[in-house]
Amino acid sequence: GSGLVGSEMCIRDRNKLDADKICDQVLVNMRARVRAETTKLNIKGKLQSSNDMGSRVQKFVDCRSKDVSERELFIVEGDSALGACKQARDSSFQAIIPVRGKILNCLKAEYNKIFANDIITDLIKVLGCGVEVKSKSMKDMVAFNIDQLRWSKVIICTDADVDGFQIRTLILAMIYRLMPTLIEKGKVYIAESPLYEINSKDETWFAYNEQEKQDILSQLENSKFTIQRSKGLGENDADMMSLTTMNPATRR
């Protein structure tokens, strides 16, 4: 008889252990859901507080025009580029936002990590069109509406070097993941900034890559010339930036 009682106790203990495990798991799941819901509400609040974006988005420089069909947004690399582009722009219709620090790779990151990133939420706020989210738990975020886009052109403007290309790629990846319609509708542009400035006599040429540099130099043949490699957008003077990168009449 005692063996039977012992085995009953074993079963009861095991059942109690199982019940405790289940309770623990339920609690863990509940806490995770509460955390996710809180995160979602915080993010939603962050993104929806976009009416007065000038005061809410750090270092964003708006333009004067309210006519969306002519407004251009330049997304530039860092504070030094912000200074150069601010001087070179036409403030009537060109606005600027610098991206500061390291940009998250949005193709690899989870949504909660993406939306907790200030650089990304600032860009979403300034763009104004919301996001296209393919996640059930995030589907009631600020829904995408292209008619709410505040810009006719969104122009990514980074240095002409390897770091610049990487930053450009990460910004494009963000737009592709969160608002691919902007790319499909032809709203996203790349501003080409020159890699070299070549001067000979009273003339100036700009080369955007090595091949163009060689082509220009082969035309100069025996003439004296000076050649200067771009150190980055922040080093370019305002006239050059306007001529090569920002003025719609002369930029690429």
Model-derived features: positions:
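Single conserved hydrophobic/aromatic residue that forms the stacking wall/gate
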Residues: G1-I11
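Short secondary-structure boundary/capping segments
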Residues: C10, T39-I43, V57, A88-F93, ...
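Metal-dependent catalytic core segments for phosphate chemistry
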Residues: R12-D20, S69-I146, Q166-L172, P180, ...
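Long, highly charged low-complexity segments enriched in Glu/Asp and Lys/Arg with interspersed Ser/Thr
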Residues: N15-T39
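Amphipathic alpha-helical
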Residues: R31-N51, I103-C106
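Flexible, glycine/threonine-enriched loop-and-boundary segments that flank and lead into catalytic domains
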Residues: K46-L73
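Charged C-terminal transducer/switch regions of large nucleotide-driven machines
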Residues: V57, R64, L170, T181, ...
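Acidic beta-strand-to-loop metal/phosphate-binding motif
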Residues: I75-E77, W151-V162
